[in-house]
Amino acid sequence: MCSSDLKCYTSTGSYVLEAGEYQISLRTDSHTVKDNLTMTCKVAENEVFQDSAFGSGVENCKYVGKRSSDEVVATNQFDDAAGDVAYLNRDTWQIVPGTSKEATAEQLEAFNNALVVDDSYVDADDTAPTFGAKNGLTLKDMEGLAYDDAQWDKLLDQLTLDDMYKLLGADGWGSAAVDNIGKGQTYEMDGPAALSYVFDAFMGTCTYKTVTYPAEVLLAATWNVDLASEFGDAISQEGKAWNISGWYAPGANTHRNAFAGRNFEYYSEDGFLSGSMSAATVGAAEKNGMYCYIKHFALNERETWRHYGLCTWADEQAMREIYFVPFEKAVKEGGSTAVMSSYNNIGTTWAGASTALLTNVLRNEWGFIGTVITDNNEEHGFMDIEKAVLAGGTNLLFGWGTKTFDNLSQTATGQLKMREAAHQYLY
């Protein structure tokens, strides 16, 4: 049986392992096989990772349900993000990219209408959670407990709304102490090649020097996952020495071309290689108690204009076969408990407030439990913490400005969403 890593994602909305013979070889380069080191893997029939009632459009297939690494079967989540684009495929190799053109009035109107997001967050059947209970528990008491252990509810009952504001809306380079649950101040650092710097507001004047490591692209060029693991171990040991709990890294986006503005922070153009490296680094760091915010989730493959509402267009197949893979492997194989969302829109939806991305794929499909922080909030109007929490996010990187919970905090539904975000973050 071939690994499901050989699967493809079809236009009909499911993963498929196609029937046939797969030759796997060890090579010195793309063209030269090393000492005839090859093996052949045979798949007798098409295997569709879906329920039989789905109807994949694939002939002569066997339905095998969800992938073993998933919690639910994968289905299309981003049809609206494909856009009006001519995509290359096996039958249309001759497509030539057109010259740039100005949007028509009709296109601009359709685009602006698509940016409008339903802000409904009221369910009449919801009951407001308890606040400020005196149950005598501390966050330390939760150590080792499952996410759904009943003790968590008792701990969360001790939080006040002010505590939630502090946890979810005022994060960045660490999180504040919350006395009602015995949570201490924590500190977090950037970036993928080092615990690079801190801010006076949290740590005082920075008088020490940290280790700078080779860039991720050089690490990936070694193809050495053991070395990637050693990197995660080393940087987390350094974090222990400086009382650093969280790390805004690794960078897990993709080299779409040689001129991307942050290629030095990302591994490679290949999702499998990038994912193998990020999973090894994250796994080693998390074993030492450092949580790693894999970033920037997702499709942050362009630096220019990314934090001014850049809209990114891609089809579901490209997302799942290339751009999501490094994050997926970091979650499933590396055990990541933290993610940083990206500035850009996926289609017309800000990635940090995309239910499809943060809830349907990351949490429900991949089984992720943990915190999803935004990228650095530099007073960008689109970075709405309420929309982020509704979509499955947890907190805002730098809670300055007008980003508040004025709406969510006024309804039982909103308060429950805030409580769930606090639960994910504290876990």
Tell me what each language-model feature is:
Residues T32-V58:
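Short beta-strand elements
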Residues T12-S14:
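Short consensus segments that form the blades of beta-propeller domains
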Residues M1-C8, E18-L26, S30-T32, F54-Y427:
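Glycoside hydrolase catalytic-domain context in secreted enzymes
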